[in-house]
Amino acid sequence: VTEVRSYAAVTAAYWAFTLTDGALRMLVLLHFHRLGFSPIDLAFLFLLYEVMGIVTNLVGGWVGARYGLRLTLFTGLAVQIVALGLLSLNDPAWTLGLSVAYVMACQALSGVAKDLTKMSSKAAVKGVAAEGTLFKWVALLTGSKNALKGVGFFLGGLLLSTIGFVGALWSMAGMLAVVLVLALGTLRGDLGKAKAKVRGADLFSKTREINWLSAARVFLFASRDVWFVVGVPIFLSSRMGWDFHQVGGFMAVWVIGYGMVQAMVPRMLRGTVDAASGAKAARLWGGLLMLLPAGLAVGMQMAPSAELLIGGLLVFGVVFAVNSAVHSYLIVAYSDADKVALNVGFYYMANAVGRLGGTLLSGVVYQLAGLTATLWVSAALVALAFVFTLPLGARARTA
C-alpha cells in the first residue's frame, strides 16, 4: 500500500508541476513575441531548457537509482519555484541580448526541474505496476501529463491576459510551494533505488534494444518540435491573425487531445502485451506517421489554409500519440525493475536531444523557408525514426 501511496503522491506532484510547465511555455512565448522577439530569438529562449534536459535526465537517472526517487522529485519541485521567482525579475528595459541571456538561464533551471520531476514519476511506475498492466499505467501517466500540459498552455494565455506576466509567475510559484510541502509530508521509503551499487559507467552501458529505441526517440520528437515549437504558433499569430487566446487555446486543444489519445492506446492496441508485439506496433505506426507531414506539406504548397493546417496537425497528433505511447512502453518493458531509473533517464535524455534539435530547426527553418519547409523536414525526421525501429527484437540483448 505504501508503494501505491508513494506513486500517487509522485504522480500528483508531477501533475501540478506539468500545469506550471505548460503555462510557463505559453507565457514566455507570447510575452516575448509581444515584446518584438523574432522566431529565432524565441527558439533560443527554449534552447537551454532542452540542453539542461539532456544533462538532467542522464545524471538524474543515476541519482534516482542510487539515492531513490524522493530526492529527485523534491529537488525538481524546489528548482522550479526558484526559476519562476527569478523569471519575474526580468526587466523590459534591459537590452535584447541581456533579456535573452537572462530568460535562457531561468529556462535552464526550469528544464532541470522538469526532467527531474518527469524522470521520478516515469521510473516510479515500474515499482508499483502489477505484471501485465504496465502498458496501461505508462500510457495513463504519459497521457494525463500531456493533457495537463495542454491545460497549462491555455492557462498561460489566460493568466497573461488577466493578471500579467509577473502575477502569473508568482501565482504558479505559490501553488508549487504548497505541493512541495504536501509531497514532503506524504512520501516515504526508497522508491526506485537500485539494489546493486550503481556505478558511473552504468550511465552509458545499455542493451542494444535500448540504444536503438533511444535513437528512434531522438528523431521522433525532433519531427514534432520542428513545426510545433515556433513554426505553428507564430504562423497562426502572424499569418492567420490569431490572438493570444486563440493560439494558446489551439495549442492546448492539440496537446490535451494528444494526451487523451495516448491514454487510450493500450485499448486500441490490445495485441501489444510484451516487447515483441510492442516492437511490431512501433514499426507499423512509424511507417504510417511518415506519410502525414509529407502529405500536409504538399497540400499546403498547393492551397494553403488554416483549416487544412489544423486538420492535418490533428491527424498527425493522433498517430504521433500512438507512436509515443508505444515507445514509452517499450523502454520500460526492456528494463530491469531496479535499473529502470537509469534506463528511463538515458531514454529521456535522447528525447531531450530530439527536442533540442527540433526546437533549433523550428526557429531557423521557419524564419528562412516558412512553414511548409518545416513540414518537409518533419517527414524526413520521421523516416529516420522509423529506420531505427527496424532492428528492435523481442527482448533486450546486450549491446
What residue spans do the PLM features occupy?
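Helix-loop boundary and gating motifs at the non-cytosolic
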Residues: 2-51, 211-254
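Hydrophobic core of transmembrane alpha-helices in multi-pass small-molecule transporters
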Residues: 15, 83, 96-116, 307-322
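Central cavity-lining transmembrane alpha-helices of secondary-active solute carriers
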Residues: 44-62, 252-265
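Conserved MFS/SLC helix-loop-helix module at the cytosolic interface between two early adjacent transmembrane helices
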Residues: 55-92
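Helix-to-loop junctions at the C-terminal end of transmembrane segments
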Residues: 56-69, 160, 261-279, 366
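C-terminal ends and interior cores of transmembrane alpha-helices
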Residues: 78-96, 287-303
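Cytoplasmic helix-loop-helix junction between adjacent transmembrane helices
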Residues: 106-145
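C-terminal transmembrane helical hairpin of 12-TM major facilitator-type secondary transporters
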Residues: 279-327
